[in-house]
Amino acid sequence: MGLYSFYRISKPSADKVPQERVAAEYKALRNRTFWGATAAYSLYYVCRMSLSVVKQPLIDEGILSAGQLGLIGSALLFVYAVGKFMNGFIADYCNMKRFMATGLFISAAVNLIMGALGFFHGPAGLPSMLIFIAFAVLWGINGWMQSMGSPPGVISLSRWFPRSKRGTYYSIFSSTPYVGEFLSFIITGMVVGAFGWEYGFIVAAAAGLVGSAVILLFVSDTPESKGLPSIYELSGEQKTKEDQMATKELQKIVLRHPGIWIIALSSAFIYITKYAVAGWGVLFLQKAKDFPLEEATQIIAFSAAFGVVGTVLAGWLSDRIFKGDRVKPAILSGVLSFIALALFLFAGGGYVMNIFYVSLFSLAVGVL
C-alpha cells in the first residue's frame, strides 16, 4: 500500500449495515468519532504547550535564553500557520482518522526527543547552541504536526453530522484547545516542579501517544466506510448547491471570498494576544511578579478554563442577547480583552487578582 492509498479518504464498505440497525449503528459510531476526535485534539494542545511550561527552568539552568526560546516558539507558530493553511485543503481528500493520528503521534515523538536531549546536556554533553538548534528544528516540525489536528477534526463534523447540528458540535469541539491548555499547565507544571523540565516534555509525549491511540480506537473516517448510508441519506437533508460541487471548486470559491481574508486577519491578531498569554504568561508571572512555577502554571490554567466558558457562551450571547448580531458581542469582547490584558501586564495584585485578570481575558477571547 502506497502513501497516497494509505491516506486517501476511505472507500465505501461492501458490507452494508442491515436497515433495522442503521439508526443505532450510526448514532454509536457518530458519538465515538466525535468524542474520540475531541478528546484527542485536546491532547494535541498538551504536546503544543509543553515548551511554555518549561521556559523558566531552561533559563535558570543556563541552557537557553529568553530570546532563543522566543525564536524556538516562533518556529512552531510560523510553520503551524503555513501547515494549517495547506493541511486544511489536503485533509478534504484524506482519511481523517489516519491523518489526525499521524500528526499527534509525530508531535509526541518530537516532545519525547526534546525531553531526552535534556539528559545529554552538561559540561561533558551537548553544548547549549546545539540544544538551541535542535529545539528550533524539532519545534518547527512540531508546528507542522500540530497543523494536522484541527482540519480533520472539523471535517469529521461534515462527514458525520447533518448541517443543522454542526454548529452545536463545533462549539464543543472548538473549546478543546482550552481543555488541552488547562491539562498542560496543571499536569505538566506539577511534573516539571517535581522532577525537572525534561519530564515536562516526556509527560506531554505520553499524552500525545494516548491521544493517537484514542483516534485509532474510536474515530471512523466516513459513515460509508462502515457500511452506512451517506450523512444526507441518514439525516434526510437535501444537498445544497455547494454540497454538489467538487471539493476543488469549493476551495477556489473560499479563497476568492474577501470576507474569509478579513476574518483570517482578525483571527491572526486575536491569536497574537492569546499565544502571548498562553506561551509567555507562566514566564512573565515568574520573572515580573515573582510567582513560583506551581502558582504561575495554576494562574494560566484558570485562563484556559475560562476560555472554555467564553467559547461555549459565545453562541448563546449572540443568539439570545444580541438577537443574532455577531458584530456587537465581538466588539465588546475585544474591548474587554484589551482591558483585561492591560490589567494583567501593568496592575499589581496577588494570586487571586491575577487569576481574575487572565480569566477575564480568556473569557473575552473565547467569545471572539
Feature names for model-found ranges:
Residues 324-368:
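C-terminal transmembrane helical hairpin of 12-TM major facilitator-type secondary transporters
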Residues 173-223:
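Helix-loop-helix hairpin linking two adjacent transmembrane segments in secondary transporters
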Residues 83-95, 311-324:
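Helix-to-loop junctions at the C-terminal end of transmembrane segments
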Residues 16-27, 225-263, 288:
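Juxtamembrane intracellular "pre-TM" segments in multi-pass secondary transporters
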Residues 105-128, 335-349:
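C-terminal ends and interior cores of transmembrane alpha-helices
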Residues 51-55, 257-312:
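Extracytoplasmic gate region of multi-pass secondary transporters
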Residues 93-104, 319-334:
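Cytoplasmic membrane-interface "Motif A"-like loop-to-helix N-cap segments
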Residues 138-179:
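Cytoplasmic helix-loop-helix junction between adjacent transmembrane helices
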